[in-house]
Amino acid sequence: MNKNFYNNFNDNNMELDFLTNDNIYDNMNNNNVNNSLDIPLIDEMSEKNDKFCKLMKKRIDGLKIIASSCRKNNTEDAIAEVGYLKDLGIANDYLNYSLIKKDIKLIYLNNDEVLKLFPTILLLLESKYDNYFKTAFQSAFVILKLYQNIIIDAKTCAFVSGVDLNREDKLKKYDKIIDFFYRIRISSKVAKNMNKYLELQNFLSELDYFLKKCK
């Protein structure tokens, strides 16, 4: 788990405010405090600890499933578990391992897997953490490199008369992929950080070309 692990509790609505509540420490240091006042405090801390332990167990169980799926090269199950957990720390680590740091020649994602990944990428893109934002656009850049020529060719090739259900299904999925890329392009976070990362500028340059070709 990375260094942002504890920050992520707020992302999961897990507020650990009892650790920073000055009133609690004032009460604990007050020798004249009525013992009856300690009981709600203990109950509150026990409840928070219980939530913490449950969240930890959920994360560990999820990581086991993801790790097992990766060992078996079962990308679909790994992506599904990442999406189910909605844990940005785990998603960030998974995308770094499976997409960004991997040789692009060794990456294969089918249409359905890409579509399942994009909601997670969009969540990371809008995160307040810079490293999550960077992971998001780098992952999107990898997917763009994998798919841009395939989608452009499919969208621009001459229409063949007759019904081709397989082609129509692919085009519908390609349209959804294009829509996700468009949502990334108009993101206020992307506009705000445009001059911060050279790689982001390169990504946007290729993305603009791709979106123009797909109109």
Predicted feature locations:
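Alpha-helical solenoid scaffolds in large eukaryotic transport, assembly, and signaling factors
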Residues: 36-215
